[in-house]
Amino acid sequence: FISYLFGLSILLPTQHWTGIYVGNLPWLILCFAQALIFILPALLMRRNHRANQLIFPLSYVIIELLLRTVPFTGFGWSRLSLTQTDSPYDSVYRQIGLAGMALVIATIVIVRNIKHILILAVILASVYFIPDNIIEEKPIAVALVQGGVVNLGLDFNNKPREVFMRHLNQTTFSISPSAVDLIIWPENAVDVDVFRNDDIRIQIEKLSQDLDTPILVGAVTRSSQGLNNQAILFEPKISQTYSKRYLTPFGEYLPLRSVAESISKYATRIDDFYPGKEFITFNVNGVKFNSLICYELINDSFTKENVNDFLVIQTNNATFGDTPQLDQQLNIARVRAIESGRGVAYVSTTGITSFIDANGKVTNSLDKFEPGTSIKEMTTYSGRTNVQKIGYSVEIISLGLLVMTLGYRRWKMDV
């Protein structure tokens, strides 16, 4: 019961924003269901048993694995391992990733022996001296455009072309020809289909041509399969397109539509999107980057892909209003910067549009809900961090050690 309350104490406040426009019931169902996962250590541990110092941290790694994978691809937003961007041991992200950070946090919580505490401190300090092969490369000048929206909420784009015009005008008035190497608009900045509305596509092409600069836009399009959430590069014609692969359950598709519609009247307003299938590397004048679109930034499986010169994250936060979601998502982007050893161009319709360096520090940012443009010369990088090399090894090893520890404890009891 205490473990369940612990789970609720984490989930209820941090995920309250999920119900801001759709009512409290979906938020409560999500949190009360996910809190069941936190019972795992209580089921495995025995009172005052020495093995608890192993079982608890190992089982907590599995808790976070379950949070990010089940049900319906999971919702790993509130993992404690995402909270250490300003801690003295933030470089753990670069070495052993989020799973490793979960292991470290849980170990710190349960260790009581002073000798073990000192050993742990030495191990954490040594993390800073583990080498990687991340190399600085040539810089690229990037402009991030935060055009804003008229209304916050689910109806942020109820007036067709309004969001597009705000980003078009902001770009026109704030960026001079050839001033930067790349202009980036956020997710949903183009609120009508560029493949079905020639006038919109032509305006973006003309803007790219007039500024002599490629423009990466976020757009919703419709294919024969259904809706697609895309990042589209204009140079000035459309040269490359990436379709979001990791869709938001109950946001971009409804896994249990009939049940969801009976719970919330807002469910009928959600159209199912069709996931993309391919990873795309964008190339602008020899500089390569990939884009994560909104919810994709919490998918740990994409970590190994973030090895291009820099990383772009495009998001639309208008549907979450003025809530902690904006700051939480920016913090997750900082984690991705640290673990990949890459600078991040993080651009949102409403905020908090920011540049993040390879150490996870925010170097430039725009005010929330105010239109603006942020320009910075970003350092690019090559090479892979250690966590990108080891993949899911920490989770696999933790699961194996947990099974072995439980088996050994059972064997000792039987002897």
Language-model region placement:
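Soluble catalytic domains of enzymes that build or remodel membrane lipids, polysaccharides, and related
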Residues: 133-389
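Membrane-embedded alpha-helical bundles of multi-pass enzymes
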Residues: 1-129, 322, 349-350, 363, ...
